[in-house]
Curated annotation (Swiss-Prot):
Pfam families: Amidase. GO terms for cellular component: cytosol. It comes from Mycobacterium tuberculosis (strain ATCC 25618 / H37Rv). The keyword Hydrolase applies. GO terms for molecular function: amidase activity. The lineage of its organism: Bacteria, Bacillati, Actinomycetota, Actinomycetes, Mycobacteriales. It is an enzyme of class 3 (hydrolase). This is Putative amidase AmiD. SUPFAM superfamilies: Amidase signature (AS) enzymes. Keywords: Hydrolase.
Length: 475
């Protein structure tokens, strides 16, 4: 286990390159101390060496990645620089459409699906000069379980530790230096779980902040697309590129997109709220981490006050039922016609969606609206809500074996995450501690709708005084 070295040596080997943050490697490419081709070749070698064990990639794209890297180098040599992502290897979750690679979404049904167009987020990455290096592994259909015939990504900190779902490949690859940032999705915690478990940084934006066009649905009104990186600064760079209105996605907001990375200094001290009454179900590692975060915020002068949130646990239960209905709709073309090709966890969830009565669904919709109204009232008093990034601290694979089948386990995990998919509020997940066995713990800063800029600035400030984001796994 080593700390990333902020002092960049004159010549970098594969290991040193892999430890750089996105913005650090981007600066070396921009100043031509490294070429994009060198960085891409180094990253591909690292993938070839480590990913047979880590299993973070569903598809690696060496030919197209190297072609994009060489094109980036030629552009930069001519003085045509597109911005921070130009020439930087980025991975995308395998539910984002890509014209040059299959999009299987963690399934076997779609393993040969070749989209005719890129997802909007992928098109925006390419337009910014990013090198798409591969498609990252995930759970089946972005739900809680892996398809039985497909490999499971391995946590680079500890192979016995859970890597999170469903953007597990994103978390593993970003932590292990197999890309310099990635694009994941989050329906109930799927950016925040892997970032927490793998010790990286992730943003679940406001619902509608980032286009979902060309992204395979799990549950349309809960799905959020966002970045996973090593730092808040890096996440700000990616979010600035992928956010914004899209004529192909009518649910995508026309709210103006600031340059989140242009000015990372806080313009005022944020007021932070914690509802301690809803943290009693968390384990000892999680509550100790939260207490340490509160002490850190107090030390830097941020007021932390007690707040009363609407009840989270009932909303997790409601979310589970409503998500199942939306998933059943999303899979109508292949389920039940090809039900035998689905894994058991995904099958059970879709079946539950088919069984839910319309009257109950409408009742749950009313509860969703009331929860969102109540949450907005809390944000009259605070700017940020504090929550762990998962309801269970760095569990083992054995502990999580029943996920998706054990309702109590699933509810415990999702209590601090899924309610904010229900409301659509943005959240940034930050490394914030470690367990006794050295595995990472994460904290969430949750903000008002479309207040990602404050979250990025607050996350950056937190990372300047903690440094957990500079830890690297022992691979």
């Amino acid at each position: 286990m080593t700390d990333a070295d902020s002092a960049v040596p004159p010549r970098l080997d594969e290991d040193a390159i892999s430890k750089l943050e996105l913005t650090e490697v981007a600066d070396l490419i921009r100043t031509r101390q490294l070429t994009s081709a060198e960085v891409t070749e180094s990253t591909l070698r690292r993938i070839e060496r480590l990913d047979p064990q880590l299993k973070s990639y569903a598809f690696v794209m060496p030919e197209t990645a190297l072609a994009a890297a060489r094109a980036a180098d030629a552009d930069i040599a001519r003085g045509h620089y597109e911005g921070v992502l130009h020439g930087v290897p980025i991975g995308v979750k395998d539910l984002c459409y890509t014209v040059d690679a299959p999009t299987a979404a963690g399934t076997t049904i779609f393993r040969d699906f070749r989209p005719a167009y890129d997802a909007t987020v992928v098109a925006r990455l390419r337009a910014a000069g990013a090198v798409i290096i591969g498609k990252l592994a995930m759970t089946e259909g972005a739900y809680l379980g892996y398809h039985p015939s497909l490999p499971t990504p391995v946590n680079p900190w500890d192979p016995t530790a859970w890597a999170g779902v469903s953007s597990s490949g994103c978390g593993v690859a970003t932590a292990a230096g197999l890309c310099f940032g990635s694009i994941g999705s989050d329906t109930g915690g799927s950016i925040r779980f892997p970032t927490s478990m793998c010790g990286v940084t992730g943003i679940k934006p406001t619902w509608g902040r980032v286009s979902r066009h060309g992204v395979v649905e799990l549950a349309a009104s809960y799905d959020h697309v966002g970045p996973i990186t090593r730092s808040a600064h890096d996440a700000a760079v990616l979010l600035s590129v992928i956010a914004g209105s899209d004529i192909h996605d009518p649910s995508c907001s026309a709210e103006p997109v600031p340059d989140y990375a242009a000015d990372l200094a806080l313009t005022r001290i944020p007021r932070v709220g914690v509802d301690w009454s809803q943290t009693t179900s968390f384990d000892e590692d999680t509550t100790a981490m939260l207490a340490d975060v509160v002490k850190t915020l107090d030390d830097i002068g941020w007021p932390v006050i007690d707040v009363k949130l609407p009840a989270l646990a009932p909303m997790v239960a409601a979310f589970g039922k409503m998500r199942a209905v939306e998933t059943a709709i999303a899979h109508a073309d292949t389920y039940p016609a090809r039900a035998d090709e689905y894994g058991p966890i995904m099958r059970a969830m879709i079946d539950a969606g088919h069984r839910l009565a319309a009257v109950e669904y409408q009742t749950l919709t009313e509860r969703r609206l009331e929860f969102t109204r109540s949450l907005r009232r809390v944000f009259h008093d605070v700017d940020i809500l504090l929550m762990p990034s998962a309801g269970i601290a760095s569990p083992t694979l054995e502990t999580m074996r029943g996920l998706g089948q054990d309702p109590e386990l699933t509810a415990r995990l999702a209590m601090p995450t899924a309610p904010f998919n229900v409301s659509g509020n943005p959240a940034i997940c930050l490394p914030a501690g470690t367990t006794a066995r050295g595995t990472p713990l994460g904290v969430q800063f949750i903000g008002r709708e479309f207040d990602e800029h404050l979250l990025v600035r607050a996350g950056h400030a937190f990372q300047q005084v903690t440094g957990y984001h500079r830890r690297r796994p022992p691979v």
